């Protein structure tokens, strides 16, 4: 990938998980989960990588492992607000063109998937870029926890222009359904605009923050990849992550 945008990768990390207490610091083969994520984000080689956290303990551990971290406020209502605060602290002069937001609970994510999230900003007109995977499991099609992308195919069917995101089974009729992966790349100007918008009606109804951008007329393009990275939300997920890391994945 010929990278033309000066890019900052930010990883939000909080201790607020109720299902898995102290999740960012959960040990995975001798290393805290948040450090695994930072390692993989850095391996994507998109530029500077920073963990944004409201926890002094996370800050200390991340920096002890050789990564950069920054403290943010505790009272943010959304991850994008935390990302924007971190951006303004790290880069008040506006040197970075784009921001990649990698969730802090993806300890086995392939660095190539992180790189691919930036592609719709590199070679297209999108304001925001994200990722999707074609759904193969029938149970996922009706699972409201699996967010679906309703979009128009672009670029030889390797990309979609997002028209809507929903927890419902959509679109209706014959054809593929797509699982949204919550990893985002923002043009700096788009992130600045996004955080200044209030929560939108459809965002509040579906409980999907990205709908705020679509309702405001912003363009979101979706790069299609082959696999959904493992997100760690439960003890079973953590056990699975430990197995994968032990296997060298």
UniProtKB/Swiss-Prot annotation:
Pathway the protein contributes to: Nucleotide-sugar biosynthesis; CMP-3-deoxy-D-manno-octulosonate biosynthesis; CMP-3-deoxy-D-manno-octulosonate from 3-deoxy-D-manno-octulosonate and CTP: step 1/1; Bacterial outer membrane biogenesis; lipopolysaccharide biosynthesis
Enzyme Commission code(s) on record: 2.7.7.38
MF terms in GO: 3-deoxy-manno-octulosonate cytidylyltransferase activity
CDD domains cross-referenced by the UniProt entry: CMP-KDO-Synthetase (cd02517)
Keywords for this protein: Cytoplasm, Lipopolysaccharide biosynthesis, Nucleotidyltransferase, Transferase
Domain of life (superkingdom): Bacteria
SUPFAM superfamilies: Nucleotide-diphospho-sugar transferases
Reaction(s) catalysed (UniProt annotation): 3-deoxy-alpha-D-manno-oct-2-ulosonate + CTP = CMP-3-deoxy-beta-D-manno-octulosonate + diphosphate
GO BP term, example: lipopolysaccharide biosynthetic process
Location(s), subcellular: Cytoplasm
GO cellular component terms listed in the entry, alphabetical order: cytosol
Main location: cytoplasm
Family to which the UniProt record says this protein belongs: Belongs to the KdsB family.
Free-text function comment from the UniProt entry: Activates KDO (a required 8-carbon sugar) for incorporation into bacterial lipopolysaccharide in Gram-negative bacteria.
NCBIfam families according to UniProt: kdsB, PRK05450.1-1, PRK05450.1-5
Name listed for the protein in its UniProt record: 3-deoxy-manno-octulosonate cytidylyltransferase
Species the sequence originates in: Brucella anthropi (strain ATCC 49188 / DSM 6882 / CCUG 24695 / JCM 21032 / LMG 3331 / NBRC 15819 / NCTC 12168 / Alc 37) (Ochrobactrum anthropi)
